[in-house]
Amino acid sequence: ACTPAIVDQPRDLPALQPTVAPQQLSQRQAIENFKIAVARIEPVAEQLCRQRSPSQNCDFQIVVDDRPNQPVNAYQTLDPNGRPIIAFTVPLIAEARNRDEIAFVMAHEAAHHIEGHIARQQNNAVVGALLIGGLAGVLGATDQSTIEAATRIGAGVGARSYSKEFELEADALGTRIAASAGFDPLNGAQFFFRIPDPGDRFLGTHPANGDRLRTVQRVAAGL
């Protein structure tokens, strides 16, 4: 178990963008919902992590990123010792309309760690750089700076190549975590449908909202 803390390290991760929605909670209600979600989600996520990935550090720390002017965002990262960190910006805590929403986002971020997405994403970046950098050489890009530029592009494409898959994996496992902690994942997943739908852009990093909803519905129906 853990207590919400404060983190001030910047992260270069995609932000969730808010949309206008009714029934915004008071600050007091939002903070209370966050604390309840931490108390119930963290033990479930830790237990599942230890069952599925016994070699991983499963001691989740859930923190508040209170730096000013932050967007609505939540992210999962690792501290220097490999401890999994789940961070919420203050605007995200305020944006969630109920306990199910804040809990589902928390479960989704915990799922990224349990599924090993950081390591897998890094591996994809390396593979993408090698493939596209190699192709540039084969196809006649003999200038070294051109090949280096192609390699950088390849790393970016490789890092994104499974990001949609990772998000759907996190939605699926997050659904199980949220439900096991006593929350309604279908109600919680509504948070994602107040943000712009990315559709099916080639280099988009998040799946279409319809795909995400179908994933949550499918997993929830089997619980």
Can you name each region flagged by the protein language model?
Residues 3-126, 180-181, 201-203:
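Peri-catalytic and regulatory segments of divalent metal-dependent proteins
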Residues 9, 118-148, 189-192:
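Post-HEXXH active-site segment of zinc metalloproteases
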Residues 16, 45, 120-125, 151-154, ...:
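Charged, low-complexity, helix-prone segments enriched in Lys/Glu/Asp/Gln
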Residues 31, 35-42, 89-90, 99, ...:
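Extracytoplasmic/secreted envelope proteins and their assembly/folding machinery
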Residues 88, 157, 198:
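Residue-level signal for pocket-adjacent positions within structured domains
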Residues 140-187:
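Metalloprotease/metallohydrolase-associated module, dominated by Zn2+-dependent proteases
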Residues 163, 181-223:
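Long, well-structured alpha-helical subdomains associated
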